[in-house]
Amino acid sequence: GVNKEEAHIRWVMAEQGAGTYTAESLNQLSLLETCAAAAGRTGVRVLVRLTSGNQFGMDEEDILASIRNRGCYPHLDLAGLQYYSGTQKRGMEKIKKELEKLDSFLDFVREHMNFEFRELEYGPGFQIPYFEGQEQTDEETLLQEFKKILDSLNFKGIIFLEAGRFLAAPCGSYLTRVADAKRCQGQNYCIVDGGINHVNYYGQTMAMK
């Protein structure tokens, strides 16, 4: 997660429980280094997260600083770059622009920092239809178009996809109990005994059956 507690990281490293860690800040890199040294671990794989302009991840300057000062992290392996800007993206244009931006940054790192990330973890944020009547995604066409974009990149390392909603959304149903029903100003409402945290995102209501 975004918040990493030292005690938790120490426990995970002691149990050999994580193959790869993400770092959201330079402070987290230092924390991972401290915990790895204490656990006697070397080559701990880390993905540094590049921000998309929000509270998550690091800006380009901090990532370049982590590469420049990688000697300060002798127990860590800066294996790759991680990037995720959000979900429910309509069309492929934003995804294409994001990947072109990432490719340009990776080119800069390789050419000017004498360093090359081996991996890129990218969350495309493919859109999933939640409401009745919404157009269903043609997955084959979508993925073929996405593949063409990936094939055009200069980056030739390993690319991992973070596609949680795209994979998980069709795989289950949300069941809850109607506790009360009412009508207010011509609108029908049901009061249910379930939460709403999983049906709201970025101010949008996501309908669930």
Predicted regions and their residues:
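Short glycine/threonine-rich loop-to-helix capping motif typified by GTGT followed
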Residues: 91-97, 129-142, 169-177
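Charged (often Lys/Glu-rich) extended helix/loop segments that serve as interaction or gating elements
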Residues: 158-209
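Short, glycine-/Ser/Thr-/acidic-enriched flexible segments
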Residues: 4, 28, 53, 63, ...
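The start of beta-strands in P-loop NTPase/AAA+ ATPase cores
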Residues: 44, 116-118, 124, 157, ...
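Oxyanion-binding "anion nests"
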Residues: 121, 146-147, 160-161
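Alpha-helix-loop-beta-strand connector modules within alpha/beta enzyme cores
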Residues: 43-47, 102-104, 142-154
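Active-site-proximal beta-alpha core segment in soluble small-molecule metabolic enzymes
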Residues: 1-119
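Glycine-rich beta-strand-to-loop/alpha-helix junction loops that act as flexible
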Residues: 85-87, 120-127, 163-166
